Amino acid sequence: VRDYISGMVILGEDQYRVGELVKINGYEGYVEEVGLRLTKLRDFDGSLHIIQNGNISVVTNQARHPMMVKTEIYVDKTLDPERVNMALERALERINGEGYKKEVVTKFINQGICNMTDFDAVYSLYGFVKPETQWRMDRIIREIAIEELLKDGLVRERTLGERS
């Protein structure tokens, strides 16, 4: 009975729909089925999670609101931070420009150095994008950042065995 009542609440409140990306009780995937008794999620590895609606305590719907993309760029810490920031700002101008207008919800910003490793300064770039574009935009940001850093000679080759 609890499963059915919970199913009616889920459907009545339109908490999630078939095809949406959600997290339910720690399981993440695309909703394949929403019934009165059960919800079925398809995980990224292909696993099918079958969850009794009465056991659902936490739902995070990732398909209805903008998602944050936080991209960390590792750069040799001996390089001039001002030059690195200038290259990253050019990268963000490209990301925030016309070419990605459909994906970007809030302009990306450079937070500067957010961490250090033995070899690198870690720069953090972040912004919000439309749901389900966050992975693609993260890759694009990395590619464009590398292009801009290369233009200024701010990327070095690592030697074998060197770690970041």
Please describe what each predicted stretch is.
Residues 1-2, 127:
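Alpha-helical transmembrane segments
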Residues 2, 37-40, 142:
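Basic side chains
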Residues 2-7, 16-17, 139:
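Short helix-terminus and kink motifs of transmembrane alpha helices
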Residues 3, 69-70, 123:
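Positions in alpha-helical segments
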Residues 6-9, 130:
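A broad detector of the eukaryotic-type serine/threonine protein kinase catalytic domain
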Residues 9-102:
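Soluble accessory domains appended to multi-pass membrane transport proteins
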Residues 79, 99-164:
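Solvent-exposed, non-transmembrane regulatory segments of membrane-associated proteins
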